[in-house]
């Protein structure tokens, strides 16, 4: 039998079952007793309705209905649907796994790119540091070379001075000795002024007073430093002005033909 014939037979059986159920319901309704509350209880005769005639399903001639075949086809259909659900589930699972693998690959790729960028950045920074170190070494070498050339020029100039060279060295040593003596005196004065700060035995109020006193002293020292700086600037300005006046006077005296006193060989004449 074909699938269409099997479905037709199934529909006929279903219609037959529905007709039987409707007939049973009608039969029950007909046989229900009608209760009437009156002075005299009389039971009416039950009226029976004619039952519908049931007709057997039409079976095609020459063919028999194989219910096992129908059941088998239903099972096969259910199995096919179940298999389709299983296949779709595994396909979705496979797709999720592929997406997860792709995501991990993207993460690893991004991590590798970031590491490469950091390596390139570190290499550029290292090259920059090396370049700065080379420039610094080159500048130091040039400065040392320039100082050596200046020293050589000074030595040549001093050697050309002849007899005045020894006196110049003596005066230079004398000035160096004076500077050393002045530095020692300064250290001695500072050592006398810089007294040890013993504040372990002081309380909170005395510490506050001591801090205030130190702050006032520091403030006064800053004022004195500023005043001395301004005084030094004025003195330098006065010296520069006097030197320019002396130079102008010497120029005028040379033009007039009168000898002028000048500094020759490090000595005033």
UniProtKB/Swiss-Prot annotation:
SUPFAM superfamilies: Troponin coil-coiled subunits. Gene3D superfamilies: 1.20.5.350. Residues 1-72, 111-158, 245-269 are annotated as: Disordered. In fetal and adult fast skeletal muscles, with a higher level expression in fetal than in adult muscle. The modification N-acetylserine is found at residue 2. Residues 24-34, 60-72, 111-153 have a biased composition (Basic and acidic residues). GO terms for biological process: positive regulation of calcium-dependent ATPase activity; regulation of ATP-dependent activity; regulation of striated muscle contraction; skeletal muscle contraction. It is linked to Arthrogryposis, distal, 2B2: A form of distal arthrogryposis, a disease characterized by congenital joint contractures that mainly involve two or more distal parts of the limbs, in the absence of a primary neurological or muscle disease. Distal arthrogryposis type 2 is characterized by contractures of the hands and feet, and a distinctive face characterized by prominent nasolabial folds, small mouth and downslanting palpebral fissures. DA2B2 inheritance is autosomal dominant. Belongs to the troponin T family. Troponin T is the tropomyosin-binding subunit of troponin, the thin filament regulatory complex which confers calcium-sensitivity to striated muscle actomyosin ATPase activity. This is Troponin T, fast skeletal muscle. It comes from Homo sapiens (Human).
